[in-house]
Every structure is written in C-alpha cells, then in structure tokens.
C-alpha cells in the first residue's frame, strides 16, 4: 500500500480522470518548480473507479482554472491551509476560451493576423464542442 501524506499549505487537484493527471502536470510545468509536487495516478475512487491527484506544496501558484476545466471538467480544486481545506472549487467547462485552442481554419483571420487572440465559445456541453468567434469553425475537445 502506497501512502501519500497530507500537505500543510498548498493546492490539491483532485478527481482528475485517470490518465489526465500527467497532461495537467505538464501543462502547469510542474517538473521545473522549486517546491514539492506529487502526481498520484490510478488511485481507487468510488465515484470514478480510478482517478489521478496532484498535490502542490505552494498555494501561491498561479493556475488558470479555466484551462483545467477544459482539460477535465470533473476536477475539484482544494486550497489547503494548516492541513485543512480552506476553499473547494468544482470546475466545469468554460463558456469562453481565449488563446488555449487554436483555430485550424486556414481562412480564419487568426491564421493571417497573428496578434488577434484565438477566442472560442462553448456551443455543445455534451459533445464538448467550441466555435471560433471569427469564422465559426467547430473544435471538438474530445475526438471520437
């Protein structure tokens, strides 16, 4: 049995779909930080079957929760102070995403004018589809 201790102060990213923890770990560039980080994979979960957890021993880290909600909307963020949960955030799919998804349409203005931000709006929550603000190109976050 593997035992991971609690953290005194920091952030716990919980209820990550199994296998998605490494994506979040890499997105947050946690391999190059000065503080302790634990990526725990394939943990038993009564709710998900298996899940991943990331524990970050630094509550000052700047995290874009919108992007985490795009990667996995089932995530729970726990802000820890003195080994107790101070705040709990449940993520969801963001309604608007800016400069995270890139438009693939070669005729889109964002392909020609590099300074224009890539803006997408959620159009279908079940299919996890977003639409480009400028050219209406559909982007599926989860490919079938």
From Swiss-Prot:
Cofactor note: Binds 1 zinc ion per subunit.
UniProt keyword terms in alphabetical order: Metal-binding, Pyrimidine biosynthesis, Zinc
InterPro entries linked to this entry: Asp_carbamoyltransf_reg_N (IPR020545), Asp_carbamoylTrfase_reg (IPR002801), Asp_carbamoyltrfase_reg_C (IPR020542), Asp_carbatrfase_reg_C_sf (IPR036792), Asp_carbatrfase_reg_N_sf (IPR036793)
Amino-acid positions noted as binding Zn(2+) in the UniProt annotation, renumbered to this chain: 103, 108, 132, 135
Cofactor entry: Zn(2+)
An annotated GO cellular component: aspartate carbamoyltransferase complex
Gene Ontology process terms (BP): 'de novo' pyrimidine nucleobase biosynthetic process; pyrimidine nucleotide biosynthetic process
GO molecular-function terms, A-Z: metal ion binding
PANTHER family in alphabetical order: ASPARTATE CARBAMOYLTRANSFERASE REGULATORY CHAIN
Family, similarity comment: Belongs to the PyrI family.
Subunit-level organization: Contains catalytic and regulatory chains.
Function: Involved in allosteric regulation of aspartate carbamoyltransferase.
Protein name (record): Aspartate carbamoyltransferase regulatory chain
Origin species: Clostridium tetani (strain Massachusetts / E88)
Name of the gene this protein is made from: pyrI
């Amino acid at each position: 049995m593997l035992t991971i201790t609690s953290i005194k102060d920091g952030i716990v990213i919980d209820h990550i779909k199994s296998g998605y923890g490494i994506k979040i770990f890499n997105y947050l560039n946690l391999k190059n930080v000065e503080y302790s980080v634990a990526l725990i994979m394939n943990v038993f979960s009564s709710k998900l079957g298996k899940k991943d957890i990331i524990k970050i021993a630094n509550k000052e880290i700047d995290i874009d929760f919108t992007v985490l909600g795009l990667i996995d909307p089932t995530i729970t963020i726990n802000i820890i102070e003195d080994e107790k949960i101070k705040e709990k955030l449940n993520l969801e799919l963001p309604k608007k995403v800016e400069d995270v998804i890139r438009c693939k349409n070669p005729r889109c203005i964002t392909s020609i004018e590099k300074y224009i931000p890539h803006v997408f709006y959620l159009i279908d929550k079940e299919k996890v589809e977003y639409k480009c603000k400028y050219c209406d190109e559909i982007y599926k976050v989860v490919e079938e």
